[in-house]
Regions:
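Conserved polymerase palm-domain catalytic core
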Residues: 74, 81-82, 154, 158-274, ...
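Helical (often loop-to-helix) elements that flank the catalytic cores of nucleotide-handling enzymes
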Residues: 283-305, 332-335
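Short, conserved non-catalytic motifs in the polymerase core
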Residues: 3, 57-65, 90-116, 130-143, ...
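Non-catalytic, polymerase-adjacent accessory regions of viral genome-replication enzymes
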Residues: 2-76, 405-415, 421, 432, ...
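Active-site-flanking structural segment that lines cofactor/substrate pockets
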Residues: 72-102
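Active-site-proximal segment of RNA-dependent polymerases
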Residues: 15-17, 21, 27, 35-37, ...
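Intrinsic-disorder-associated, low-complexity terminal segments enriched in Asp/Asn/His/Tyr and depleted
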Residues: 424-427, 440-441, 448
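Right-hand nucleic-acid polymerase module
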Residues: 19-23, 108, 117, 226-235, ...
Length: 455
């Protein structure tokens, strides 16, 4: 007899509207669980693999060189602590980053990163199979560009329907969770993890990481990291930005929202990148109803709330998502992102012109911006970046002045936000042949635009 096809295993945390009240219920069907994963993780070979993963891209940092100098001793000590269940997290090093906005990043010692890589290597592949298809953050073969492509594919479908029937309009609901990483409830997160992880040793280790007694991660409502005194921080909420386990927990936590929207509300055009959610529909009323259901689900089940960026608009206005402004017909960088790229290109051009940056390093930096620009319609921005490059570097070389002999005053735009400059024909550099401009730009790693040479 043919084998009976097993129904897909899934765990759905959903709400049912009964007597004007929401009730949380767990629906378990053929659920797969993890057992004895802690003992498998606690081996010298596994820690050595995790060590190699943790040092990728930063192996020459002093902290990592110091640990690598006595690698066997360090891994043996770590293995002993894990086997005896006496492992404790080290102290966090805290600092602020300002891109894309002010964030408090918490960095852990390198030995703790090895442990987190061991946890990640066993837990994330298991949970990744349960996630919905249209969750794109911190997943293999996903990412921001894939998310932008999928959303634009949906917009093109909606645009074709509007062309066939002009009376049908399509709208989008943009959901943005307020201070997501600072508001994740520890008890709810641990309850979600316990459903699938049936290993007490692993749960004890995860609880030590989540409920770290030496560090607070949560912010009270209405506060930002920079204006909240440390004594007012909360110890029962929040996750440290910068931890590998934090991005994994963030996806697991909001997977409950994904399952609720897809299986309970029946939303087909739903896409999420970390805490940014976009939903498409032909009915404004339907979007408002979904928004109310989602907001109540977040408040009562996940102890989260939406911020004032949440909005319902026509898709013809474009959608801000993963750093781009996306339409059905084209895609542009957000204005704030374009201003930041212009500002950074001015800085690296200035550093190259005075000899503070090598050409190889300049090419690497320029290639990273090129990687962003090739995924959107950026003809005007490429022209402006090429103009900046010529004004800072090529002018000096054409005048026969060595880069190390000249000090160019640092532009004011490096300290303040600059406005996007339109490249008018009357302030372009002198026309050159297309071949000369293309060759110079390729050598420097800058995207060549035919406008600069008159082509």
């Amino acid at each position: 007899l043919p084998r009976r096809r097993r129904r897909p295993a899934r765990l759905i945390l959903f709400l049912r509207f009964m007597e004007n009240e929401y009730q949380i219920e767990q629906y378990v069907e053929g659920m797969s669980v993890l057992t004895d994963v802690y003992d498998k993780m606690c081996s010298y070979e596994d820690l050595e693999i995790s060590y190699r993963e943790a040092r990728k891209g930063k192996r020459y940092r002093p902290e990592i060189l110091k640990f690598s100098d006595k690698l066997e001793t360090g891994l043996d000590l770590l293995l002993f602590e894990l086997n005896e269940q006496v492992y404790e997290m080290g102290r966090y090093r805290m600092f602020y980053v300002h891109e894309p906005k002010l964030r408090l990043v918490m960095s852990i010692p390198f030995r703790d990163r090895i442990v987190q890589w061991s946890i990640y290597r066993y837990l994330f592949p298991f949970y990744d199979k349960q996630f919905i298809e249209d969750s794109y953050a911190c997943r293999k073969d996903k990412g921001s560009h894939a998310a932008a492509d999928k959303l634009q594919y949906w917009l093109r479908q909606a645009h074709r329907k509007e062309l066939e029937n002009p009376d049908k309009k399509c709208y989008y609901l943009k959901l943005d969770i307020s201070k997501y990483f600072y508001r994740v409830n520890h008890e709810i997160l641990l309850d979600i993890l316990r459903v699938r992880i049936h290993d007490e040793k692993m749960m004890t280790l995860l609880e030590r990481i989540i409920n770290n007694p030496n560090q607070k991660f949560g912010l009270p409502a209405g506060f930002s990291p920079e204006d909240c005194p440390y004594e007012d921080w909360l110890d029962d909420t929040g996750m440290p930005i910068g931890n590998l386990t934090s991005q994994m927990f963030a996806n697991i936590y909001l997977d409950q929202l994904d399952q609720f929207c897809k299986h309970t509300l029946g939303i087909s055009h739903y896409i999420r990148y970390m805490d940014d959610v976009i939903i498409l529909s032909e009915s404004k009323e339907e979007l408002h109803r979904w928004k109310d259901c989602i907001e109540r689900f977040l408040n009562e089940c996940l102890a989260l709330s939406l911020n004032n960026k949440t909005a319902i608009r026509p898709i013809t206005l474009g959608i801000d998502f993963v750093g781009y402004k996306i339409w059905a017909t084209h895609r542009k960088l957000k204005k704030s992102t374009a201003r930041k790229i212009i500002r950074k290109v001015k800085v690296i051009c200035y550093q190259l012109s005075i000899g503070e940056m090598t050409k190889d390093e300049f090419k690497r930096r320029a290639a990273s911006y090129h990687g962003i620009l090739i995924h959107c319609n950026s003809h005007g921005l490429c022209t402006e970046l090429n103009r900046i490059y010529c004004s800072y570097v090529k002018t000096l070389e054409q005048n026969g002045i060595g880069l190390s002999q000249v000090v160019v005053p640092e532009p004011k735009e490096t300290k303040t936000e600059v406005q996007t400059v339109e490249c008018h024909r009357n302030n372009r550099p002198p026309l050159r042949s297309c071949e000369d401009a293309s060759r110079d730009h390729q050598q420097a790693g800058i995207v060549h635009s035919g406008d600069e040479c008159g082509g």
